[in-house]
Amino acid sequence: MEKIVAKKKFGQNFLKDESVLQKIIEAMPNNDNKIVEIGPGLGDLTKFLVDVKSVDAFEVDTDLCKVLQNKFEREIATKQLRIHCGDVLTAWKSELIEESYDLVANLPYYIATNIILKALADPKCKNILVMVQLEVAEKFCANDGDKVFGSLSIITQSVGEAHIVVNVPPSAFEPQPKINSAVFLIQKKSDRSDKDFEDMLRVAFTQPRKTLMKNLSSTYDKAMLQEIFEKLSLAQTIRPHQVSTNDYHQLYKLARSLDGTRERTEC
């Protein structure tokens, strides 16, 4: 068989360390959900997944689709595996699959954050177990007060719980990336928070080294913010990463309430 060369445009790094693959399988939540795998590559993780559950795999690389179709001919025939050739983000414009599912994947780094946020927003997705760049995993799993605590951490904490399963060195891949990776798990308890809340978070963390007051006052009324900060006992010098997830939710609720009150008063 012709050797498959990893393509940079698809961010391909094939996971070859079977001990890491086994740890991913061991970390999978125990349930009856289907599995969605994005970027199955050469099928190194897929071969473990189809042994335990039925899998829908989404692969954008047509060359790899052919490899997968040949490699898993039996599993495809028994409907243990369905391979979808094409861009998963295009497929996600409608329903990805009909059933409840867990996302389990070694994600291409260049679209990892976007895919995780899409999965968090998808009510059919119940758990997310993925390999990503270590820096990205730390942001999703950060706790209140951590230096890397930010909007991704808050969005994640708002819908469930997250933790890093295992750190993965470059030597586990072929070709070897220049960065460290990690597998992490998000267990969803509810659906993703609303868009307006996430818009506020983006403003709050626009310049992480600035104060939260300064960042928010670029978009929101400063007098209103001062009133909210006082109600929540937040110092006006506090920085974005020093505010808890709960306080961000309270801040958002008060901002909506006060905005609505002022609009009615002005009318």
Curated annotation (Swiss-Prot):
One of its GO terms (cellular component) is cytosol. Keywords: Cytoplasm, Methyltransferase, RNA-binding, rRNA processing, S-adenosyl-L-methionine, Transferase. The keyword Cytoplasm applies. GO terms for molecular function: 16S rRNA (adenine(1518)-N(6)/adenine(1519)-N(6))-dimethyltransferase activity; RNA binding. It catalyses: adenosine(1518)/adenosine(1519) in 16S rRNA + 4 S-adenosyl-L-methionine = N(6)-dimethyladenosine(1518)/N(6)-dimethyladenosine(1519) in 16S rRNA + 4 S-adenosyl-L-homocysteine + 4 H(+). Gene3D superfamilies: Ribosomal RNA adenine dimethylase-like, domain 2, Vaccinia Virus protein VP39. It comes from the Bacteria. It is found in: Cytoplasm. Pfam families: RrnaAD. Specifically dimethylates two adjacent adenosines (A1518 and A1519) in the loop of a conserved hairpin near the 3'-end of 16S rRNA in the 30S particle. May play a critical role in biogenesis of 30S subunits. Belongs to the class I-like SAM-binding methyltransferase superfamily. rRNA adenine N(6)-methyltransferase family. RsmA subfamily. This is Ribosomal RNA small subunit methyltransferase A. It comes from Sulfurimonas denitrificans (strain ATCC 33889 / DSM 1251).
